[in-house]
Amino acid sequence: MATKQTRSRANLPKHPLLEMLDVRSAEVEIFAYSVKIVCGKQAETNCCCVAGARPGVYATEVNIQNLNLVPALVVKLVLPLINSGAVVAREPNVADPFALPGRAIEEAVRLPPLGATMDDCCRIAELLLGAPPSGDTGLTIAILTIVSLVELSVSAVYTANPLSGDGISIDVEYIPSRRLGLRGRD
């Protein structure tokens, strides 16, 4: 007896991200979140081209919660634009997560129903450098891409203070989900 065929795994585009999420059909929805990361210290400089940010100390903390009653498989990719003070993706250069050495792509994390996790500057540095940093680190600006088969709640907490230590700025942003397309228009 014939059954209606749906797009199978054989018809999926080949991509390591789809394998990590264990995507089995082109009909599945994939939710993606793009979070700006600003971490470390931007020192005063006499150079004409200060990369990324004004002098100061910056930190980012990203909260991820699974507001579903089923477990959520979550994959995270870190795309460094400035890595510990070195500009690595100023045009014409680009950050390609699948060409980066080390652990820029984290293995899938399973969040239990209503469970949560976080990524902070220490975790981002560990993913980019292969180990947690010791001491002050230079400015790192990156994009943390979070991908899941279920919609998540994602927020980012940004703090900054001037090098003088006078005052502090804190900002919280809620990151909207976007649908990740598996292929172009049919």
Where are these regions (language model features)?
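Gly/Pro-rich, tryptophan- and cysteine-flecked surface segments typical
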Residues: 2-186
